[in-house]
């Protein structure tokens, strides 16, 4: 085992109130669970695993349940965007990088709503150059990963989004990392 120095972490737990839509949906999850427990629904149609998965999606962003629902200003995603933008501004002199972990709603090429694209578009709208925001999923070969990590270490990429399996292990960028946002999902 390597005895590398580990920086001391500051953990911040953000507590958000659910939107009215989220409260209604949680109530509907309880109704669904009751029907499942009572055997009133075919397990292929609905089951506790589906209900739990829908709950995880709802906790992240209600648009993951139905992309026609409104973008709630007080959502986890919007709080992450605000925090990421603030840290980006503060760390600009050092060109430090932030990691944003999101295990649900990874990037899709089919145009459906996903958190990764939503975060990137909102950060770009706030003024962060698009080329400073990357997804680990775009580096789908070892060569592309090495190129991406080099851009991170040089300060060309300042915000890197990824899932825990893809970004959590084997990522050698700690020399420039200033913040990790893992509360997104």
Map each language-model feature to its residues.
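Inter-lobe coupling linker of SF2 helicases/translocases
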Residues: 1-70, 86
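Phosphate/oxyanion-binding active-site loops and adjacent basic polyanion-contact surfaces
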Residues: 69-81, 111-116
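SF2 helicase motor core recognition
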Residues: 55, 146, 159-185
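Short glycine-/polar-rich loops that comprise or flank the Walker A/P-loop
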Residues: 9-11, 128-132, 157, 174-179
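Conserved strand-helix element at the start of the C-terminal RecA-like helicase core
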Residues: 40-48, 92-119
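Generic beta-sheet signal
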Residues: 12, 96-100, 157-162
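Conserved helicase ATPase core of P-loop NTP-dependent helicases/translocases
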Residues: 120, 124, 129-167
